[in-house]
Amino acid sequence: MYSEIYFMIPLILLIALTLDIVIGWPEKIYENIGHPVTWIGKVISYFEHSLNKREYSKKSLKLLGVLTFFLTVFPITAVAFLIEQMLLSFYYGFVIQALLIWPFLATKSLYTHVKDVADALDKKDLIASRAALSRIVGRDLKNSDENTICGGAIESLSENTSDGIIAPLFWAFLF
């Protein structure tokens, strides 16, 4: 049974990637429940604001950082592992696994956001290109010129290809 699932991994990843490329993360779903990556970010942010205090020693901060890691990663990993184990007994469990991997991919979203920047730059519209880039970077773009905006879009594309496509596929492949 367990060996059979390993032959299904490429199919599971292909289904998840295809869903993301074709559908992305639908706006209606995002409006109603948000996005799993956003949920995890909120958990991390909560721990950061609760535990990362200037008055704590470096040793305490490191210990609290490790605690944050385990309180964030362990429950998510445990739940994912339990779900995967339950799905192994279902004939079409691989489809459900693909549906569970799909939200962690950002292929269509990344393409759309970077294309919005490129389209605005093609029209020589710095205001629109700054606005489009501000949706994918966290820096101040008030005085950004065309080269800075283009560089920011390329940098974001590179980083987010790793974070939003390669890493989720890699970890899904391993686990």
Predicted regions and their residues:
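Hydrophobic alpha-helical transmembrane segments
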Residues: M1-F175
